Design a protein with these regions (language model features):
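N-terminal Rossmann-like FAD-binding beta1-loop-alpha1 element of flavoenzymes
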Residues: 2-28
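Glycine-rich FAD pyrophosphate-binding loop
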Residues: 21-41
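Central helical "cap/lid" subdomain
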Residues: 32-38, 236-291, 331
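Dinucleotide-binding Rossmann-like beta1-alpha1 core, especially the glycine-rich loop
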Residues: 42-168
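Short beta-strand to alpha-helix junction loop
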Residues: 103-116, 138-148, 188-207, 326-334, ...
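Active-site lid/adjacent beta-loop-alpha segment flanking the redox-cofactor pocket in flavoenzymes
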Residues: 125, 268-271, 275, 283-380
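Helical element adjacent to the flavin cofactor pocket in flavoenzyme catalytic cores
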Residues: 147-159, 181-241
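C-terminal catalytic lobe of FAD-dependent flavoproteins
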Residues: 163, 192, 298-299, 343-427
Length: 427
């Protein structure tokens, strides 16, 4: 089939690759001048299937409220909240029920595990190298932090994910550069998890997909997607309609506006909003003082990753405010938390003294759905497919989501149960 993909982040490019492998003629439309320059650009890079879980969890609304005015809170609400934000929060609150959380967590972790397998298969088949390292450690500042992670660890036991609870001294053997002056409680080590450079992988996979015949139309802003005997893509500022057998929407937060005219007659809703995350990236100052792989500060939900000759610190989630990804809209408190966490654990790891010259501060608009799992599958409109709403887990879920979508397009049964990824759950 002749298939169009809207969006060239990691979700769009992996989808293009899998569809091309199946023999389809694929064209990818991207509004920017390069691929992977939005949510895929500077994320933490962590791939930890056992730690992929919905934000909609029992007790989570109370936690967010309690930290509403905390400077270093992992989740921040920024006022004003528009109607889309309020609708999203209502769905989110409704999904915080225990049975809903357990079901969605199971779906996300199954997809994440499958996605890691697909990532390894693609990496081996195409001989890709993209700043990978193995191992992931969750740092626990106190006994209270340790108690808080026990429910998650029980899930890891039940699902067979290898991990070990270790003391601070054992953690220092794995990560010798941990700050000797930081007297922390302990850690959880997951040796089979990993970290990798999402954007570098996406760029490499773009080249592989082009070898399979995929075409990339950059600087091309899609104004609308329609169906009238064919799937139709309208290009902004051009009196042009392009016809395809199918269209796959992978445009992140921009998908909601493009899909609204299609979904409204069907009385279907897509409560997709941007939740802003942040990262700082800086060159390694002294390798002996830098992390070897990836770690997460459990209290602040901030990840510290080693990506080649750089250290990246990523975290925070800001809901609401002005939906604007410009530098002027950055949350300075969220960014200050990243510097604090880096200094607490690896004070001499990176060149951060001359911030303007050596530190890259990044804000990304994560395309978040309120209940956790992405939407993968048919939209309800003939020949219009969806692969979107992966939120902060896009990198961890990308390769699996792409394969599931490609199997659906081919009317094949996916390798995992994909029934929980449908759009009908928001009706």
């Amino acid at each position: 089939m002749k298939i169009a993909i809207v969006g060239a982040g990691v979700i769009g490019v992996t989808t293009a690759y899998e569809l091309a492998r199946d023999g389809h003629e694929v064209t990818v439309f991207e509004r920017n001048s390069a691929i992977a320059v939005e949510s895929s650009f500077a994320n933490a890079g962590v791939i930890s299937p056992g730690y992929v879980a919905p934000w909609a969890a029992p007790g989570m609304p109370l936690k967010v409220f309690k930290h509403l005015f905390s400077r270093h809170a992992p989740v921040k609400i920024k006022f004003p909240l528009n109607n889309d934000d309020l609708t999203w929060m209502w769905y989110w609150w409704r999904a915080c029920k225990l049975d809903t959380y357990i079901a969605n967590r199971s779906r996300m972790q199954a997809l994440a595990s499958y996605s890691r397998d697909r990532l390894h298969a693609i990496t081996a088949d195409a001989s890709l190298e993209f700043e990978r390292s193995e191992g992931y450690m969750v740092l626990l500042r106190s006994a209270k932090d340790s108690a808080m992670v026990q429910p998650n660890l029980q899930v890891l036991r039940e699902t067979g994910v290898p991990f070990k609870e270790i003391s601070a001294s054992e953690a220092r053997l794995i990560e010798p550069a941990l700050n000797p002056d930081n007297d922390f409680y302990g850690a959880v080590h997951m040796p089979s998890d990993e970290v990798g450079n999402c954007r570098e992988f996406t760029l490499l996979l773009k080249s592989e997909s082009q070898r399979l015949g995929v075409k990339y139309e950059l600087n091309t802003n899609v104004a609308g997607v329609f169906y009238d005997k064919f799937a139709i893509v309208n290009i902004a500022n051009k009196d042009t309609s392009l016809f395809f057998d199918a269209v796959v929407m992978c445009a992140g937060v921009h998908s909601a506006a493009l899909l609204k005219p299609l979904l409204k007659p069907l009385k279907r809703k897509l409560p997709l909003i941007p939740v802003y995350g942040y990262s700082i990236s800086a060159g390694v100052r002294e390798p002996l003082n830098a992390p070897r792989s990836a770690l997460m500060d459990e209290r602040y939900k901030v990840a510290i990753s080693r990506l080649g000759n750089r250290v990246r610190v990523a975290g925070s989630a800001v809901i609401g405010g002005k939906h604007d990804n410009s530098p002027e809209n950055r949350n300075t408190q969220a960014i200050s938390t990243l510097y604090k966490v880096l200094h607490d654990w690896f004070p001499g790891a990176a060149h951060i003294s001359n911030m303007g010259a050596s530190v890259h501060e990044w804000q990304g608009a994560r395309p978040m759905l309120p209940d956790g799992p992405p939407v993968i599958g048919p939209s309800g409109v003939p020949n219009i497919w969806l692969n979107l709403g992966h939120g902060s887990s896009g990198w961890a879920l990308s390769c699996g989501s792409a394969r599931v979508l490609a199997d659906m397009v081919a009317h094949r049964k996916p390798d995992i149960d994909a029934s929980g990824f449908n759009i009908e759950r928001f009706s």
